[in-house]
Amino acid sequence: MALRTLVSRRTLATGLGFRQQLRGLQTFSLPDLPYDYGALEPAISGDIMQLHHQNHHQTYVTNYNKALEQLHDAISKGDAPTVAKLHSAIKFNGGGHINHSIFWKNLAPVREGGGEPPKGSLGWAIDTNFGSLEALVQKMNAEGAALQGSGWVWLGVDKELKRLVIETTANQDPLVSKGANLVPLLGIDVWEHAYYLQYKNVRPDYLKNIWKVMNWKYANEVYEKECP
């Protein structure tokens, strides 16, 4: 997996092991959204959604694919410094693609159930782990508002402990960077590009309103798959 590939001079020198890992890396493509750009209004404006998807997410995809191509070339030439440099680009842009692909699924228009409280086993798990849905939302909003710079706030599940967790990650680091057993259920993008056109510098208002279009049905499906 691109985000876990560690490049070293020793790996490059031996060659075979890293080349086998490299074969598992694939180029990415921009996924279609399951709704129109304006379908999440007024919580998230159509202008933001279009810019976020077509420009920002597309840039992560383009830069990842470019870095992957350059990595293949550097490996073939035995260029260890370039390989090490490209690892950072692959991690950042690959994380950007993975995180945003989850983010789009985490949202749904109100007419399609966006904002409806979680049902089933996830609803029970939230009450057990946090006391109530309101307490969970309050904690995630506080974590997201307090995050310095750019990053993400996540609701995840530890698939071994069967326990819900709230985590933040910096920049485009995915949730798995906080633990190999963590699976994302919901991720909220708190980069300024996710809200600034509409909410200016008032991130708490964005965090408050995004719950009105949260796709808890999707989150519950992931939870039940990981914790049957």
Curated annotation (Swiss-Prot):
Top EC class for this record: oxidoreductase
PANTHER family the record matches: SUPEROXIDE DISMUTASE, SUPEROXIDE DISMUTASE 2
Keyword Transit peptide applies: yes
Domain of life: Eukaryota
Localization: Mitochondrion matrix
Residue stretch of the organelle transit peptide: 1-24
Assembly mode: Homotetramer.
Organism lineage string: Eukaryota, Viridiplantae, Streptophyta, Embryophyta, Tracheophyta
Entries under InterPro entries matching the protein: Fe/Mn_Superoxide_Dismutase (IPR050265), Mn/Fe_SOD (IPR001189), Mn/Fe_SOD_BS (IPR019833), Mn/Fe_SOD_C (IPR019832), Mn/Fe_SOD_N (IPR019831), Mn/Fe_SOD_N_sf (IPR036324), SOD_C_sf (IPR036314)
Pfam families tied to this protein: Sod_Fe_C (PF02777), Sod_Fe_N (PF00081)
Name of the protein in its database record: Superoxide dismutase [Mn], mitochondrial
EC annotation from Swiss-Prot or TrEMBL: 1.15.1.1
Major location category of this protein: mitochondrion
UniProt keyword annotations, A-Z: Manganese, Metal-binding, Mitochondrion, Oxidoreductase, Transit peptide
